[in-house]
Amino acid sequence: MSKRLVAYFSASGITAKVAENLADAIGADVFEIQPEVPYTKADLNWMDKKSRSTIEMSDPNSRPAIATKRDNMDEYDTIFVGFPIWWYVAPTIINTFLESYNLKGKTIIPFATSGGSGMGKTNEKLAPSCPGAKLLHGKVFNSYSSKADLSAWIETLSL
């Protein structure tokens, strides 16, 4: 069995809950992707065209800085990457995270939380950030997703 990591970014705590349940269900290590400058409630106001999140998501080259890196990334074969869906894709801080490592030969599996949006163009936007990695199609979960739901999803991946 390969060593697994569940890395996640959570703005509201919902993705954190799903990530912790996933890690517990599959016996994986956990790493929180934290922005160097934490997001405020105003930063996350998607209705404000001048909010930080809106500005970042409007710029495909935006790469918000992350506070810390995972030192032993080379030990992991499979990396689950979790995030809330923003504008039908992963927040650009996920690109920052992926681009911070050599992921060649690793399996990357995105998972997301959303109140109603699907994965949209997430894989299309993440693929350039993890060259040489096997990027699987992910799944969206809601805040009520149980460990059993997550385990059932993992079974479909044939890892």
Annotate the PLM regions:
Residues W87-Y88, G116:
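Acidic catalytic loop of the alpha/beta-hydrolase fold
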Residues F83-P84:
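Glycine-rich, N-terminal phosphate-binding loop of Rossmann-like dinucleotide-binding domains
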Residues I109-S146:
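Short, glycine-/small-residue-rich phosphate/pyrophosphate-handling segment
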Residues M1-T78, Y88-A90, N95-E99, A148-L159:
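N-terminal beta1-alpha1-beta2 submodule of the flavodoxin-like/Rossmannoid cofactor-binding fold
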